[in-house]
Every structure is written in structure tokens, then in C-alpha cells.
Amino acid sequence: MTSPILDRDRLSQQLQDLQAKALQAIATASTLDALEQLRVAYLGKKGELSQILALMGKLPAGDRPTIGTLANTLKEKLLQELEARRATLQAEKIAAQLAAESLDVTMPGVYRPQGHIHPLHSTIDRILDIFVGLGYTVANGPEMETEYYNFEALNTPADHPARDMQDTFYLPDGNLLRTHTSSVQIRYMELYEPPIRIVAPGRCYRRDTEDATHAAVFHQIEILAVDEGLTFTDLKGTVTTFLAELFGDVPIRFRASYFPFTEPSAEVDVQWQGRWLEVMGCGMVDPAVLKNVGYDPEVYTGFAAGFGVERFAMVLHQIDDIRRFYTSDLRFLRQF
């Protein structure tokens, strides 16, 4: 018994009806999920188009190419409409998200309190700016040092009486925490040939009993210049220019002093608010120090100066106790 033969016109009408129904459903789909369900319903393996195509075997052989062409045309049409509707829905979804996440720029912002530069750091920056303007290069070195760089290379051997002038933090491995930034000068001179002009800022450590003017950890800045023909007059001119930039037009005096790594040496005072304040030590680099780094003291001379940053900051900001710098008291820090 043979299968009944379908009429070509009947199957063609089914394809036309499917197209009209599918296009209407696609055009009214409101979500991407709904659109995907329509794709499966019409074009899936068990979809309506597949069910119609399954009937093609009952058509006369001569009608099958015609129905096949109509079916392929319908499939391409539906795929195009599905993709176009998908693009539209995606654009609408993005637009809705942007609208929901939009910011009203007229609304008041959330206040974020501003921080302040610590008075020690602002003082360091100000001092470095002055010396960089005078042609000096900023140099840095390690805070953990060897006895050689901290003492011996600076003309302070183990049996030198000046060792008793500083109480030092020694570490278990035999190294120490530097007591001054002069060690940076030695390291720099070992690496570079004259002429050199450097300014070396950094933390230093000494076994001082803490009080209003002393701290075990403090900041120091030192300068060093080495060249042919430098004299004490050049040192005085540099120091005077620096102090005038920092404090303004104030009286300055130099007093003879002693440091193991400079000869001659001097202390420098400024007259501030009616009294003399000691602000730094300085001097001509001892020839022995130049020899230690391989410089010929018959050809080169140099000068150096060093001072504590805390002392300068206390004078500039009229702070009465060095310990205020390290308490992290916002009532104090907000003043700067």
C-alpha cells in the first residue's frame, strides 16, 4: 500500500502561513529569551519548519525542488529577521542599563577630606629644591651601614676619640644603623670622579634620650662639593645663599668647631627672633677622606655641610617639641 501523495499547493500554503505567523511573533518579541524560544520553535530540529519539510517525501518528485526552494527562502528570511530583532533588543537593553546607571552631575558630591604633606617632608622638599637650584644632585644611600662607610672612611678609625661622641645602634651581624648621611658621600665619591655636587637626605639613628629637642630617629641632609680650587669662601657663599633662601635676610655667623672628616670646621648660627640658633656644621673635606675614595688631595678640594631637618622644621613652623612630628596627631598635622 503506497503513501498518499500530497498536493504541492497545500504544502506551499503551509509555508506561507508559517512565514506570516513567525514574522509576526518575531516582531513582537520583547526579550532576548523570548526571541530564542521563537527560534527553537520555528527553526529548531523539532520546529515547525522541520515538520513541514518532513512531508516533502510525500510530494511528487517533480514538485520537491519547488517546495525545497520555498523552504530555504523562508529559513533565510526568518534568520535575518531573528538577527535584526536580536540587535534591536540588545541595543534597547544597553540603553536601559545606561539610563539606570546614569549620574546626575548636579547632585552634591561625597566629601573626601584632603590630606596634608607632613611638615618634615615639606621641609625636606623645600631644602632639596634650593640645592637642586644651585646645581646639586640628590643622592641616597642605605640606612644600614658598615663601620667602614659610617666611620673609618670618614677619618674616624676604631681608636679615634670621636667614636665616643656618638652612641650607635649596632646590629647582630656587625653592621649598624647610620648615624649621619655622610656615608652617602663616601659611596658617591667611590662611584664618580670630580667635579661632584650632591645633596643627601635621609633618616639617621642615634642612642639619644628622647626629649623636646632630641630623638633616636631623625632626618639629616648633607651637601658635598668636590672640584679643583674650592675654598672656604665657596663654602661660606653656598651656606649663606642657602640660609637666605630658607630664612630670608637674617644675620649669620660662623664659629670654629671640630669634626673628624673636615678641616677647618665650623658651626653656623642664624639670628632668629632675637636669639642665635645653631643650625648646621660645615667645613673643608679632610684630605684623608679624599684619599680614602681615591681622589688626589693635591688636585682636588671639597667642602661639606650637614644639618638636622627637624631643627629647621621646628624653627620655620615654631614647633616647641620634636616629638610632635612622630605622634600622628591629626590636630597637629592639620595645621600644615
Curated annotation (Swiss-Prot):
One Pfam family named in its UniProt record: tRNA-synt_2d
UniProt keyword terms in alphabetical order: Aminoacyl-tRNA synthetase, ATP-binding, Cytoplasm, Ligase, Magnesium, Metal-binding, Nucleotide-binding, Protein biosynthesis
Binding site for Mg(2+): 263
HAMAP family, A to Z: Phe_tRNA_synth_alpha1
Family membership noted in the UniProt record: Belongs to the class-II aminoacyl-tRNA synthetase family. Phe-tRNA synthetase alpha subunit type 1 subfamily.
Quaternary structure and interacting proteins, as annotated: Tetramer of two alpha and two beta subunits.
Name of protein: Phenylalanine--tRNA ligase alpha subunit
Species whose genome carries this gene: Thermosynechococcus vestitus (strain NIES-2133 / IAM M-273 / BP-1)
